[in-house]
UniProtKB/Swiss-Prot annotation:
One GO CC term on file: cytosol
Task of the protein: Can catalyze the hydrolysis of ATP in the presence of single-stranded DNA, the ATP-dependent uptake of single-stranded DNA by duplex DNA, and the ATP-dependent hybridization of homologous single-stranded DNAs. It interacts with LexA causing its activation and leading to its autocatalytic cleavage.
Name of the protein: Protein RecA
PANTHER family in alphabetical order: MITOCHONDRIAL DNA REPAIR PROTEIN RECA HOMOLOG-RELATED, RECA
Residues given in the record as ATP binding sites: G74, P75, E76, S77, S78, G79, K80, T81
Keyword Oxidoreductase: no
Pfam families in the cross-refs: RecA, RecA_C
CDD domains: RecA
GO molecular function: ATP binding; ATP hydrolysis activity; ATP-dependent DNA damage sensor activity; damaged DNA binding; single-stranded DNA binding
Gene3D superfamilies: P-loop containing nucleotide triphosphate hydrolases
Compartments, record wording: Cytoplasm
Coiled-coil annotated spans: none
Native organism: Ralstonia nicotianae (strain ATCC BAA-1114 / GMI1000)
Gene that produces this protein: recA
Record-stated family: Belongs to the RecA family.
């Protein structure tokens, strides 16, 4: 009996001490700096579409998560910048503000416009050094008014000491230290301001690797740890119209995912000058989900024929955007992914 009273008394003292500690923390760091998980509802992850229906499904939550760091890497001409510009276009459709930090000094504004990016509204910076690029990113994140920042690319974030030094100077680990410091500084602010930051990265080969993949990404290991999502993008084939190559068949693997199960893959077409062939994906996934019926070469929707052959069907959906959106939303519902255009950023602000 006495033991029970003693235990209850100790438990009450512990609760009292915990309440005092929580009050002190809230007084020092502000309300909401610490809370019990049961006190607040777990909010669903806010996402922005990648512009590819298949990749949105592979990501498990319907797109790239906001308030997180994302890394997109792959070989040259695999579609890294194209995919990222599609994300920019999707964020702008929701009414978001986007910034593109072009460390490679290679952004093709005309191509971005063709992919649906509202170029006059896009914030563009072409910094001289890696430090300058990351300081600009930090300032934009801290402002709380930017919804998406793209840094193209990590390999081009050259430290100031390297630019000011001589050719051939050995400066080991300088870029890795720069990235590590920047990510330590950025991560907390990115979460608070709900800004999505995408780092585009290149592939390098490790020398003397006997077992496992010799491939690695630039900028050290920090980005691998801080990124919530890592996408490996590869070109796996060409799309031809007669003898002319009109696009690439692309495969994206979700190498890391902190918001849904990883290691899923998506295969889609990237057409030159047009970007990801959304209509092609709607047809393929629509047939899989039995939303679109396929009989021989003919494709039908709700009992009505929409085209003979995949190319004709794709062209029909491109010309009938409302029908394409209707089919896409049915496919998304079937696959358990958020419907397109469900909530815009303006509506989110009004709700708050």
């Amino acid at each position: 009996m006495e033991d029970g009273k003693k235990a209850a008394s100790m438990s009450a003292e512990k609760q009292k001490a915990l309440a005092a500690a929580l009050a002190q923390i809230e007084k020092q760091f502000g309300k909401g700096s610490i809370m019990k998980m049961g006190d607040a509802e777990v909010e669903p992850v806010q996402v922005v579409s990648t512009g590819s229906l298949g990749l949105d499904v592979a990501l498990g939550v319907g797109g790239l998560p906001r308030g997180r760091v994302v890394e997109i890497y792959g070989p040259e001409s695999s579609g890294k910048t194209t995919l990222t510009l599609q994300v920019v276009a999707e964020m702008q459709k929701l009414g978001g503000t986007c910034a593109f930090i072009d460390a490679e000094h290679a952004l093709d504004v005309t191509y971005a416009d063709k992919l649906g990016v509202k170029v006059p509204d896009l914030l563009i910076s072409q910094p001289d050094t890696g430090e300058q690029a990351l300081e600009i990113a930090d300032a934009l994140v801290r402002s709380g008014s930017v919804d998406l920042i793209v840094i193209d690319s990590v390999a081009a974030l050259v430290p100031k000491a390297e630019i000011e030094g001589e050719m051939g100077d050995a400066l080991p680990g300088l870029q890795a230290r720069l990235m590590s410091q920047a990510l330590r500084k950025l991560t907390g602010t990115i979460k608070r301001t709900n800004c999505l930051v995408i780092f585009i990265n290149q592939i390098r080969m490790k020398i003397g690797v006997m077992f496992g993949s010799p491939e690695t990404t630039t900028g050290g290991n920090a980005l691998k740890f801080y990124a919530s999502v890592r996408l490996d993008i590869r070109r796996i084939g060409s799309i031809k119209k007669g003898d002319e190559v009109v696009g690439n068949e692309t495969k994206v693997k979700v190498v890391k995912n902190k918001v849904a199960p990883p290691f899923r893959e998506a295969i889609f077409d990237i057409l030159y000058g047009a970007g990801v062939s959304r209509e092609g994906e709607i047809i393929d996934l629509g047939v899989e989900a039995k939303v679109v019926e396929k009989s021989g070469a003919w494709y039908s929707y709700n009992g009505e024929r929409i085209g003979q052959g995949r190319d004709n069907c794709r062209e029909f959906l491109r010309e009938n955007a409302e029908l394409a959106r209707e089919i896409e939303n049915k496919v998304r519902e079937h696959l358990g992914v958020t419907p397109m255009g469900a909530v815009t950023l303006a509506e989110e602000v009004e709700e708050d």
